[in-house]
Amino acid sequence: MQFKSVNPYNGEELASYSSLTETELLGKIEESEKAYSDWKETSLQKRCTLIQKVASILTENAHEYAEMITLEMGKPISESLAEVKKCAWVCEYYAENAQAFLSDTIIKTDASKSFVTHSPIGTVLAIMPWNFPFWQVFRFAAPTLLAGNTALLKHASNVFGSAEMIEDIFIKAGVPAGVFQNLIVHHDTTETILAHNSVQAVSLTGSERAGSAVAALAGKHIKKSLLELGGSNAFIVWEDADIDAAVNTALVARMLNCGQSCIAAKRFILLDGIYDEFVTKFTEGLQTMKSGDPLEKDTQVGPLARVDLADELQKQVKESIQKGAKLLLGGGQKDAYHEPTILGDVTPGMPAFDEETFGPLAAMI
């Protein structure tokens, strides 16, 4: 199977990737198991030194990695650069604090001596999303590897270029072969990977549907699972709020990463006394945000990561309007680009109220 990486801003193909064969996949899983035998015995000090080196490589090559993020999923370059720097920070943070985090903790029981100790469990599968293609991986990988585990990455298929770069960073840092590996595979192979005796756990960040499917597989094969799923967060504004401050916060909370975040503010619940003022100022603020080529440093709003994602958002907008929502701003779509959109008078029963909206849509309630 071939996977294509496509620039969502202009539709140009960036690269093509061939899926691993079943034999190649099993070989990588077995390599991870072999690497675990040595990695778990590697001193914590050595592991910390290597993760610190990962942080240095991220910092030194931040612009190169940020450009790949922007090309593959359309994030404005300024945000991509911030993402890479945050990845360096998380590596430094865990490397500096690993000793404290992994130290034994004495606890009181009826026994003469009781304590909690931390031991690695083996190979961990990471199923990661496209919206923060570097951050989601490094916030998993740094603590996982420092704890003595090995990792297999199954990234979203539209950001395989980022995934390849991430694996290369660990190689350049001197992390032993097999400790961190990227798998170019279809999501249909998830059960094959999870069912393998070498894989002890899975960490997934993604949709509720994906999480439900992976949790079921983990349960079937009695593997540990850690899930971070979607959200439809409410942003509540009271009548005594500083409206200007609330609007400034709301613009960032809704529009960061073009609204493609599980923790983004999506539904704005406004008390009657400040509804008009907030909506007016929020609309004015949104109109000042610059849309355009995400590689340009002053661009604030780029395309969504894929055309089908923009199509889905457009469907949610139209259905909400059909059910009585008022279009206050935007509403248009061209390919992967969706205009920043504000809907007013949003009520239960509308997609803008009931569903997670993964894009630049603000629902005023």
Give the location of each predicted region:
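ALDH superfamily catalytic-core signature
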Residues: R209-T347
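Well-formed, non-transmembrane alpha-helical positions, independent of function
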Residues: P143, T192-I193, T249, E319, ...
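Residue-level signal for inorganic ion chemistry
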Residues: G11, R47, I69, C91, ...
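Short glycine-enriched loop/turn motifs at secondary-structure junctions
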Residues: Y9-E12, T49, A177, H196, ...
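Structural signal for hydrophobic packing residues in well-ordered secondary-structure cores
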Residues: E33-Y36, K40, A55-A62, A66, ...
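Short, well-ordered beta-strand elements within core beta-sheets of diverse protein domains
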Residues: A15-S19, A35-E41, A126, F235-W238, ...
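Rossmann-like NAD(P) dinucleotide-binding subdomain of oxidoreductase/dehydrogenase enzymes
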Residues: S103-A245
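N-terminal Rossmann-like NAD(P)+-binding subdomain of aldehyde/semialdehyde dehydrogenases
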Residues: M1-S112
